[in-house]
Curated annotation (Swiss-Prot):
It comes from Leptospira interrogans serogroup Icterohaemorrhagiae serovar Lai (strain 56601). The lineage of its organism: Bacteria, Pseudomonadati, Spirochaetota, Spirochaetia, Leptospirales. Formation of pseudouridine at positions 38, 39 and 40 in the anticodon stem and loop of transfer RNAs. Keywords: Isomerase, tRNA processing. This is tRNA pseudouridine synthase A. The active site is at D26 (nucleophile).
Amino acid sequence: MIVNFKTQRVIQNFSKFLLSLNAITDSGLSILNMTEVDENFDSRFSCNSREYEYWILNTKYPRPTWKNRTFWYQHRIDVPRLEAELELLKGEHDFRSLAKVASLKGRSTVRTILDVKLERSLELEGLLKVKIRANGFLHNMIRILTGTLLEISNGKRKDTNVLEILSSKDRTIAGITLPPYGLYFIRAYYDSYPKIDFMYSHLDFLK
């Protein structure tokens, strides 16, 4: 995750400063890289799109070493159907039915899905990654979306599709909210600040 801050003095040595910061951070936090940007940059509002992944471990038995890192799902998944549903999501849609109702409070629920696909892990059999990039997300949107897609692709909702659920604009029509573990923030995109891209070049640990 990218954050920005201002300093009263010029940082002469980024590498040394990075080591110093990591020496005082909590054990659950690590700062991996840093660079200088102009004063107009804002890590939140300068962002054009964000990318997330939701990991599903589709195996008959759970894997203890993956507990709380993926959502274990032992039921059959119709993968071609799941991939077809993901394709339907591309473009601009109203995601009111896939958001936590209490979080809306008059906010726009229209978002644009720029890219979405299913990736099968080569390292772990049964591990599926729903990869989604959009210009913005609603509260719990990805977790509700993935839960809904699982219900469609396992046959529970075989006679409907995700577009029909979106058009209903009714949260009660959609599926369950999957747990937060399994959801990973991958990166933010800053089209006006291409120099930031290099900060993600070494982040291949989720591939």
